[in-house]
């Protein structure tokens, strides 16, 4: 493991879990937290018509509607791809876009994704940006920690992809330093051991509202799990069994327990989130027909489409896809697929919760229309089932 800026003196460095009134602590009071997995890229998983748009205005409208419905979290990915990497070559930066939503929302946690090693990003920059966004959002902003898994992305920044486990060691050093910068009451100096940066008399204000911003990690590897256990508050998990809900429910309990037990070793707690796409209509037959229509429009391999491109990745989290030991899903867009009537959707959400999942970051094929349907038909049943209070 990395040699990092472990705290030996000075103030008690706290995080959002240490404050009952923090937005994170309040969100976690829900038996199953609800989040949106926004699409800020012009990516299409099917040619079936949809209202979706990568634009800021569209995504703001969706987030505001989700907030009205009581959703706790908004999140988006970010990627660095060459021309042709996206279906329409248009994308917004998650760090900026989610931060900007602080001014037009009131209660949702806003989680920006940023590749912390590209550049590499200096901790003083990130600490100041984070403290500023935390101030604007009144403690509702957080960061999804990404180290980068695609070779093409590292190459875009001028070097070869860094070894998988070393990336997490480098990120661990960065976030130990960030925590110090956010929490220290005096100037802080540090010489990077794994990263090519140093700090001399670093000082960051304003201090974050609840110790530091909410930290999120999406991972599935042993190195990533250890990093998340040490640093993160929320962990995006993926199904070791692939996208089919049956396989997910078989494999998730052990996987989730491993992550939570690892956090306990460090005297910490984490909550787990997973990313389902929810495809629902009034009857099972209608929901399957909707899923069939989406699947029929999927791009074929070799076409100029994000969903058909096979970028070189060393990520561990999606290895369940294509594993012949497990039932396979339809590859409709989420990490797992929940397809059925509203009643069946809720049954599957209950099963995920029993498997140790604390929240869902939902994809919808049509974010505007399917979110409205979710609010009208599924959310009331979730309340009846005890998933929402």
Residue ranges of predicted features:
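N-terminal beta1-alpha1-beta2 module of alpha/beta enzyme domains
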Residues: 2-104, 207-213
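An alpha-helical appendage that flanks or caps ligand/catalytic pockets
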Residues: 2-40, 68, 165-208, 239-354, ...
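Active-site mouth loops of central-metabolism enzymes
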Residues: 43-57, 114-124, 160, 209-222, ...
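Alpha-helix-loop-beta-strand connector modules within alpha/beta enzyme cores
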Residues: 85-111, 170-172, 256-264, 374-389
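Conserved, mostly hydrophobic/aromatic
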Residues: 34, 66, 70, 101, ...
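Catalytic domains of carbohydrate-active enzymes, especially glycoside hydrolases
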Residues: 57-78, 227-238, 351-357
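Hydrophobic faces of well-ordered beta-strands that scaffold small-molecule active sites
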Residues: 32-38, 74-76, 110-113, 141-145, ...
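Glycine-rich, proline-tolerant flexible connector loops at the mouths of alpha/beta enzymes
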Residues: 73-95, 239-250, 362-375
């Amino acid at each position: 493991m990395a040699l990092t800026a472990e705290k030996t003196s000075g103030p008690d460095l706290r995080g959002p879990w240490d404050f009952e009134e923090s937005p994170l602590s309040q969100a976690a009071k829900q038996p199953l937290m609800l989040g949106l997995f926004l699409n800020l890229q012009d990516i299409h998983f099917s040619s079936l018509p949809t209202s979706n748009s990568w634009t800021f205005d569209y995504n703001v409208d969706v987030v505001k509607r989700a907030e009205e419905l009581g959703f706790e979290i908004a999140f988006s990915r970010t990627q660095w791809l060459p021309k042709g990497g996206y279906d329409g070559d248009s994308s917004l930066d998650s760090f900026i876009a989610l931060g900007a939503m602080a001014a037009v929302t009131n209660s949702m946690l806003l989680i920006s994704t940023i590749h912390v090693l590209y550049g590499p990003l200096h901790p003083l920059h990130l600490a100041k940006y984070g403290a500023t966004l935390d101030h604007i959002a009144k403690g509702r902003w957080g960061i999804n920690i990404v180290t980068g898994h695609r070779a093409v992305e590292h190459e875009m920044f001028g070097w070869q992809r860094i070894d998988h486990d070393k990336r997490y060691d480098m990120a661990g050093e960065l976030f130990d330093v960030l925590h110090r910068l956010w929490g220290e009451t005096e100037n802080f100096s540090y010489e990077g051991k794994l990263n090519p940066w140093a700090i001399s008399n670093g000082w960051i204000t304003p201090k974050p509202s609840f110790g530091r911003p909410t930290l999120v990690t999406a991972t599935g590897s042993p190195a990533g799990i250890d990093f998340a256990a040490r640093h993160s508050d929320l962990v995006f998990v993926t199904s070791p069994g692939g996208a089919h809900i049956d396989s997910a429910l078989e494999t998730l309990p052990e996987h989730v327990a491993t992550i939570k037990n690892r956090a306990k070793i460090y005297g910490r707690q984490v909550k787990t989130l997973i990313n389902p796409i929810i495809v629902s209509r009034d009857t099972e037959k209608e929901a399957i027909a909707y899923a069939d229509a989406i699947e029929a429009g999927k791009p074929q391999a070799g076409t100029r489409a994000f969903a058909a491109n096979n970028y070189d990745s060393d990520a561990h989290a999606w290895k369940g896809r294509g594993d012949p030991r497990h039932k396979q899903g339809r590859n409709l867009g989420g990490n797992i697929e929940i397809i059925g009537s509203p009643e069946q959707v809720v049954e599957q959400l209950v099963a995920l919760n029993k498997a140790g999942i604390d929240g869902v970051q939902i994809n919808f094929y049509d974010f505007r229309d399917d979110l409205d349907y979710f609010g009208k038909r599924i959310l009331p049943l979730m309340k009846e089932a005890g998933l929402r209070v």
